[in-house]
Swiss-Prot record:
It catalyses: 5-aminomethyl-2-thiouridine(34) in tRNA + S-adenosyl-L-methionine = 5-methylaminomethyl-2-thiouridine(34) in tRNA + S-adenosyl-L-homocysteine + H(+). GO terms for biological process: methylation; tRNA wobble uridine modification. It comes from the Bacteria. Residues 249-635 are annotated as: FAD-dependent cmnm(5)s(2)U34 oxidoreductase. Transmembrane segments: none annotated. In the N-terminal section; belongs to the methyltransferase superfamily. tRNA (mnm(5)s(2)U34)-methyltransferase family. In the C-terminal section; belongs to the DAO family. The gene is mnmC. GO terms for molecular function: flavin adenine dinucleotide binding; oxidoreductase activity, acting on the CH-NH group of donors; tRNA (5-methylaminomethyl-2-thiouridylate)(34)-methyltransferase activity. Keywords: Cytoplasm, FAD, Flavoprotein, Methyltransferase, Multifunctional enzyme, Oxidoreductase, S-adenosyl-L-methionine, Transferase, tRNA processing. This is tRNA 5-methylaminomethyl-2-thiouridine biosynthesis bifunctional protein MnmC. It comes from Azoarcus sp. (strain BH72). Pfam families: DAO (PF01266), Methyltransf_30 (PF05430).
Length: 635
């Protein structure tokens, strides 16, 4: 469902007000006082987060973000705070960032925190958005959409609940029995809750869901509030790993991404690769594309590529802000239609999804020609916040960001076996190189060389790109896609491609594949190849690990290759401590960073950065539940 932003309005006394719901965003006696008295003190904070590794707060309505800012500020002020703070919140009508800035200016004491939040504020697209703040110590996970859907899709273990939103009379859906039972599903064993509402139906609904509630003195002109705790068994937080060490096999975008994400959480990572350095396989191309693939029904591919693109660019911006020499530019991506029928479908997709125009809009042939700097016969999609990334520089930046948390082993062609409670990586002579309780297979097509990965239907797809001489500033000035893609000039070269041949193991550059790439380029930009001064003599061949459904494989590796009887995905036996990060196909840049964040969150017992149905769609064991589909030899 498209996201409709909140409109900025104020009540007569100046309190932020929603015309859609006819209610104020916080108490007219003061939003900050309400946040401290009702939501923080009502949940026993800051005392309850002291001494913990992490503390997870789940909120039903983000609104202005005032409860989040108050929680973040209180956490920063407390010298005995938890190591990490997770704040998870739903919002059906999020504010535009410029409106948030105006609202946050009312609380100058939060100015530095508010500025950081605003600088990281995500695109107003439906789904989950994860923001890393305060040097990664504070994690804000936002679900833009209906809270009934969001709470059902979230995977988290909440220590405290903030029940905030417009009044039950104005917004009954947010105070329904379904909401309360969804909160109970997320509750940790010692979870507490607090809310300003003492309505009878709220008290009774919470009791029926398993919460014990009591009235307490309210804030300002409101005489009473509610606080409570969960009486059910709840979900015990995943215990911290006794030894936070992992083996990561493979140092392409997948392996370096998970290594960086684990190192950011304090893990020690042993990174092993058969090559002499990072990005020597499919991740070694001169330039690749980071952009989504929308669909009319907003299917899983569409949602995952959107989430991966948005999170991927936020990750790139964090690395660049840290001063790392990562080569990437969100110059925009044009995806042109093949024919008039597809052009009409692309227009319909844009109209149906109604995403922010800065993220996706339809452009005519005339506008596409102007944007790209070359005349084209048809229009298509314009992704204004997407662009190109140089994969080797991303891999290098990930390793630099991981610092001493990552120890690399090059020229390490290894075998993997479990010994007692650890996975051991040994070289060809049997010498032990590294061992850890957790092992992650991120070796691209090399994953097929590990017998334990036999349940994973990874196939190799050969891809050849062509490198064309390109003066700086020459057309096209943005990334352009149709049946293939072409990048703008990057260090004097333009990357065009790519072929996609399943089961082809020829590692040599082929003239016929250069011709195929040029044919795709000519079909996209009529007359362009005739203007080339020279035909491509340079290029690169890579072998991409692809899956039958074109979605990556992220999670625990199944311990069997077939099922004797039907069962649920969660019931499939897994190898203890063995995980896969593979099947990225031609979209390694799109998948890698978000997939790594998802797996790292699973390993650390944190709230997940994706909806549950999307996490299941990535589970490596999913292929045991259905017949494998044939992977077509096209991209």
């Amino acid at each position: 469902m498209p996201i409709t932003p909140a409109s900025l309005s104020f009540a007569e006394d100046g309190t932020p007000y929603s015309t859609a719901y006819g209610d104020v965003y916080h108490s007219s006696d003061g939003g900050l006082g309400q946040a401290h008295h009702v939501f923080l003190a009502g949940n026993g904070l800051p005392e309850r987060w002291r001494g913990r590794e992490r503390f997870v707060i789940v909120e039903t309505g983000f609104g202005l973000g005032l409860n989040f800012l108050a929680s973040w500020a209180a956490w920063r002020k407390d010298p005995q705070r938890s190591e990490r703070l997770h704040f998870v919140s739903c919002e059906l009508h999020p504010f535009r960032v410029e409106d948030l800035a105006l609202l946050h200016a009312r609380w100058p004491e939060f100015a530095p925190l508010a500025a950081e939040l605003q600088a990281n504020w995500p695109c107003l697209a439906p789904g989950v958005h994860r923001l890393h703040l305060d040097g990664g110590r504070v994690c804000l996970t936002l679900y833009f959409g209906d809270a009934r859907d969001g709470l059902a899709q979230l995977d988290a273990r909440a220590d405290a609940f903030l029940l905030d939103g417009f009044s039950p009379a104005k917004n009954p859906d947010l105070w329904s029995a379904r909401i309360f039972h969804l909160l109970a599903r997320l509750a940790a064993a010692d979870a507490t809750l607090a809310t300003w509402s003492v309505a009878g139906e709220v008290r009774e609904g919470l009791r029926r869901a398993g919460f014990e509630v009591e009235k307490a003195p309210g804030f300002g002109g409101k005489r009473q509030m509610l606080r409570g705790r969960y009486l059910g068994r709840g979900h015990r937080p995943a215990p911290a790993a006794a030894e936070r060490r992992a083996l990561v096999i493979g140092a392409g975008v997948a392996g370096t991404s998970i290594a960086e994400r684990l190192a950011a959480r304090g893990w020690q990572v042993e990174l092993l690769d058969a090559a002499s350095g990072p990005a020597q396989g499919a991740s070694g191309n001169h330039a690749g594309v980071l952009r989504p693939l929308p669909s009319l029904d907003d299917n899983r591919m569409g949602r995952l590529t959107r989430a991966g693109t948005l999170y991927g660019w936020r990750h790139i911006q964090r690395l660049q802000a840290a001063g790392l020499p990562l080569r990437a530019e969100a110059c925009g991506v044009l995806h042109l239609a093949r024919d008039a029928a597809q052009e009409a479908k692309m227009r319909a997709v844009v109209e149906r999804l109604a995403l922010p125009p800065a993220h996706l809009r339809f452009v005519s042939a005339a506008e596409a020609s102007e944007i790209g700097g070359w005349p084209v016969p048809l229009g298509g999609w314009w992704f204004g916040d997407s662009g190109w990334v140089q994969p080797p520089s991303l891999c290098a930046a990930n390793l630099s960001a991981g610092g001493e948390g990552i120890r690399a082993h090059w020229n390490a062609r290894v075998t993997l076996a479990r010994a007692d409670t650890r996975w051991q990586a040994r070289d060809a002579q049997g010498a032990l190189l590294a061992e850890a309780p957790v092992a992650i297979l991120a070796a691209g097509t090399g994953i097929t060389g590990f017998p334990l990965a036999a349940p994973l239907p990874v196939v190799s797809a050969r891809g050849q790109v062509s490198l064309l001489p390109a003066p700086a500033g020459s057309a096209p000035r943005v990334v352009m896609c149709r049946m293939g893609y072409v990048s703008p000039a990057v260090d004097g070269l333009r990357c065009a491609g790519a072929t996609f041949d399943v089961g082809d193991d020829d590692a040599t550059l082929r003239a016929r594949d250069h011709h195929e790439n040029l044919s795709k380029l000519e079909a996209m930009l009529p007359g362009y190849t005739a203007a080339l001064a020279t035909q491509p003599a340079e290029g690169r061949v890579g072998f991409r690990p692809a899956s039958p459904d074109r979605l990556p494989m992220v999670g625990a590796v199944p311990a069997l290759t077939t099922l004797a009887a039907p069962c649920a995905l969660a019931e499939i036996p897994r190898h203890t401590g063995l995980y896969a990060l593979s099947g990225f196909g031609a979209r390694g840049l799109v998948w890698a960073t978000l997939a790594a964040e998802t797996l790292a969150s699973q390993l650390d017992g944190e709230p997940l950065p994706l909806e549950r149905d999307l996490v299941d769609a990535l589970d490596p064991a999913r292929f045991l539940l259905r017949p494998a589909r044939t992977l077509r030899g096209e991209d």
